[in-house]
Amino acid sequence: MGGVFASEVPVGALAAQTLQNVRRQYETLFQDDAVKSAFAFLVKFAHACRSEDPREALKASGISMAEKATLLSIVRTLKDQIPQQQAATEYGQLTIGAAADAIGHWYKQNASQQMPLFKPSSEFLDSWRPLGNGSGFCELSRLFFGKVTERYLNYFLERAASATCPSLEHRERFQEGIRSHVDAVSQHAFETAKITQSFAAG
């Protein structure tokens, strides 16, 4: 990353500041109410997928799901489960976006049959059944925290770049240049979690 516009902006300083900010955020992640609310929804959602009637299981957990759900309606239900005071913060928005991304990515890769994005479907149970097993939930969890990492990195990089880059043009060029590095870090975090799980299972 040192070669990305190093002559124009202090890349090393930006990277160090960004990593410090992300590290500080992760040290208190367990205290973040939005993260706890979003993850609680993922847990309840996955657990409901083990039930014969997922909607009733969700209802018993205080979550109302449309009888004929769409992927977007599930994401809306997620957002409804985050209290307004948590969702209103910048970190809250990052968390909600990460959870929505994780749900969409997991569904695209794992759902037993694809449910329409907009058109209501009665195949909720069959489509999401794989989420109810251990491996399905573990993958969703890894996706969630990987997406949280990715969004934190982008957020803090943009803040650091805004304060350091000499012009809007330089900032845009820098952000474009480091985007691939952010993606690589997020993928590394995801793969590390998979390796850790494999060793734990062994």
Regions found by a protein language model. Give the residues of each.
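Solvent-exposed aromatic/hydrophobic patches embedded in short alpha-helical segments
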Residues: 5-10, 18, 132, 136, ...
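Membrane-interacting alpha-helical segments
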Residues: 137, 145-146, 150-202
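Helix-boundary capping/turn motifs
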Residues: 66-74, 119-124, 154
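Solvent-exposed flexible segments
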Residues: 79-83, 87, 98-112, 116, ...
